[in-house]
């Protein structure tokens, strides 16, 4: 079985309704009880944090491995727990500032960022130094799809062999796993 030096995971976090009523014109639907809903039907199956933590990612990782874990504002604290459960130590947080800015989902402040948490086990690879941790990158047309920019960036700084978990398409020189692609790995 291949042990991976780089793993990218974009878990299908489970979302629900978002908070209290607002006079904001951004609120899509206000219910008689004062609650408002900014929820929408997510076009894929989701998983609870417990289910995500239970995945055997540690068994796929090389003794020297970097994990890039996508998360949103809502799941940021849980993402750190997932990192630990999978056997990785936190290193850095990379930020995708979505452009153009939209309304985001929920909260007083509409989050228009997503985070790519870098975790590591073992030794860091000798790599190119990148002089920033945030990027303004155009939004993709599909919900939750990440810009190719980040995969290209990861290929620049992190070693092969590489695995993308919860992948949506095949990518040259990567193994993939997920229910939207023909998986090249069993979990």
What are the residue ranges of the model-derived segments?
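Class I S-adenosyl-L-methionine-dependent methyltransferase catalytic core
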Residues: 1-187
